[in-house]
Regions:
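N-terminal type II signal-anchor transmembrane helix
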Residues: 2-37
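Short, surface-exposed patches at the edges or C-terminal ends of soluble domains, predominantly
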Residues: 168, 196, 204-208
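A structural signal for short, hydrophobic/glycine-enriched beta-strand patches
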Residues: 27-181
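A transmembrane-helix-recognition feature enriched in membrane-embedded lipid enzymes
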Residues: 27, 174-201
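Short, highly charged low-complexity linear segments
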Residues: 78-79, 182-188, 206-208
Length: 208
């Protein structure tokens, strides 16, 4: 083996080890964040959308919305922002279904900021103007535990100060969360390196 080949092999091994270490540390951080719950008050609650079925919230979305209602009813924040767009062929957006659910359960429409978006970055991007117009700086973040780290990181890039309040009644539990934690670890690892905005543009090139 030539000296050059040995050097190349050594560099490759160091690079591979660095990548494994970086992803491993990120995985631990995503997991640790998932276990955090704040007791803070804030200017607004941001609840991230997920699947709806013909205008009816999925079990996961309903769990997030019920967590949001509990926080709102406790007076933890006076305003709620809902997010999530439409899947191809859908009649309703995730945000629209969320807003309707909250309103039916007693939240005035004037207290709901409706956004959209195809991913977490676009979700936050869609609600930022409405929140900024109302002077919102601090937010409580309602989503599944495994999604908290990325959601809060993106909210921070838009100038908000987030606190975690993950749903405690998600239907995704136990071993079923493993692929979700893996996905979030990859997304956070990539987002930190290239930027969440660039990652979103790559994933959804036709969207702003």
């Amino acid at each position: 083996m030539t000296l050059l080949l040995r050097w190349v092999l050594r560099v490759c091994l160091v690079l591979a080890a660095s990548i494994v270490l970086y992803v491993s540390v990120t995985a631990v951080q995503v997991w640790l964040t998932s276990r955090q719950t704040s007791e803070n008050h804030a200017n607004a609650i941001v609840v991230f959308g997920t699947a709806e079925y013909n205008g009816v919230p999925s079990a996961d979305l309903e769990a997030r919305l019920n967590e949001t209602l509990a926080l709102y009813q406790l007076g933890r924040a006076p305003l709620i922002a809902v997010t999530g767009g439409k899947q191809p062929g859908d009649l309703y957006s995730e945000a629209g279904v969320s807003a309707a659910y909250l309103h039916i359960h007693g939240v005035p429409l004037s207290k709901i900021v409706v956004g959209g978006g195809s991913d977490t970055y676009q979700n936050v991007q869609s609600i930022t103007p409405g929140l900024q117009d109302r002077g919102v700086k601090t937010v409580l973040v309602v989503t599944d535990p495994f999604h908290e780290d990325r959601a809060m990181a993106i909210l921070t890039t838009f100038g908000f100060s987030p606190s975690p309040d993950p749903t405690t009644s998600s239907p995704i539990t136990g071993w079923a969360t493993v692929p979700y934690f893996a996905k979030e670890t990859i997304a956070v690892s990539a987002g930190r390196l290239v930027g969440y905005g660039r990652l979103s543009s790559t994933s959804h090139p036709s969207n702003p």
